[in-house]
Amino acid sequence: SMLLALRALAADEVDACVSSGNTGALIGLARHCCGTFEGVRTVAICAQLPNLNHPSYLLDVGANVDCTASQLHQFARMGCGLVSSLYPLDQTHGQKPTVRALSIGVESGKGNQAVTDAVALCADDASMDFAGLIEANQLLMDDCDVVVCDGFTGNIALKACEGTANYIRRYVQQALPENPRQSSG
């Protein structure tokens, strides 16, 4: 069960916990059994996105529909911690993970108040290389390590990426003959 797996994780008997159960239940049990990192009050769901050079990590993708600037900043710090634990520093952009905030434009001041205020918090945080805003059409093309957003926006962006990938796969499958030798003439 989820509870047993999370207790094993909290006791350092295992390195990770994977579940196909209810996400809300998993998050609640994880907070109860494992707690959170110091200074982190809000849980976020993180998704790995493919990228041209290395994966990016998008968070939140569904745990928090509305977020404050402080929560978005916490997500950025959690994402940086994840990237730093997975990859040696020389495999990221520099000595610190690169962070962007998902918004409706890349110009300064774009986005809602939480995003605008989070930009200031992240820009002042010496633990990360904050690279500004990013639009959804660049999620799979940009070299940033971490992208932060509220769970509503992140879930929509993730589902749009998944849907586009499924469309391309189906389109290619329909365009190719069932037997590739048939088209070789």
What are these regions (language model features)?
Residues 1-44:
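N-terminal glycine-rich phosphate/adenylate-binding segment common to multiple enzyme folds
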Residues 1-13, 65-68, 133-141:
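Glycine-rich oxoanion-binding loops at beta->alpha junctions
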Residues 14-17, 24-25, 55-58, 97-101, ...:
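Structural motif
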Residues 22-25, 32, 106-107, 152-155:
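Short glycine-rich anion-binding loops that position phosphate/pyrophosphate groups of nucleotides
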Residues 28-33, 70-71, 111-115, 158-162:
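Short acidic, glycine/serine/threonine-rich loops at helix termini
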Residues 31-58, 142-147, 151-185:
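Glycine-rich phosphate/nucleotide-binding loop
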Residues 66-132, 136, 145:
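Glycine-rich phosphate/diphosphate-binding loop of Rossmann-like nucleotide-binding domains
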